[in-house]
Amino acid sequence: MERVVLLLAMISLVKSDQICIGYHANNSTEQVDTIMEKNVTVTHAQDILEKTHNGKLCSLNGVKPLILRDCSVAGWLLGNPMCDEFLTVPEWSYIVEKDNPINGLCYPG
């Protein structure tokens, strides 16, 4: 009996050190677009992007924003060569992306 308990304890330790990443089954109909996929169903979503703008881009605590011009965030992060100029920016307070930037995931734009 002691061996069975010890064996079960060892199995539970082995399984508890694994992290599995995947989609959760839920009844949500909320879908979002990620960098790599479109229409991914999520359990909880909150839109945190600003929809209006007053035309001013301010520094926050003296740190300027990163204005991506014709690059998308995905193109910048995933290595579109047209976005290489932004790789050397040491810091930024927030990121500014145009609505439909020319240089996205595909190269050339």
UniProtKB/Swiss-Prot annotation:
Homotrimer of disulfide-linked HA1-HA2. Major glycoprotein, comprises over 80% of the envelope proteins present in virus particle. In natural infection, inactive HA is matured into HA1 and HA2 outside the cell by one or more trypsin-like, arginine-specific endoprotease secreted by the bronchial epithelial cells. One identified protease that may be involved in this process is secreted in lungs by club cells. Palmitoylated. Gene3D superfamilies: 3.90.209.20, Hemagglutinin Chain A, Domain 2 (2.10.77.10). This is Hemagglutinin. Its main location: virion. It comes from Influenza A virus (strain A/Shearwater/Australia/1975 H5N3). The lineage of its organism: Viruses, Riboviria, Orthornavirae, Negarnaviricota, Polyploviricotina. Residues 1-16 form the signal peptide. It is found in: Virion membrane; Host apical cell membrane. One of its GO terms (biological process) is virion attachment to host cell. It is a single-pass type I membrane protein. Pfam families: Hemagglutinin.
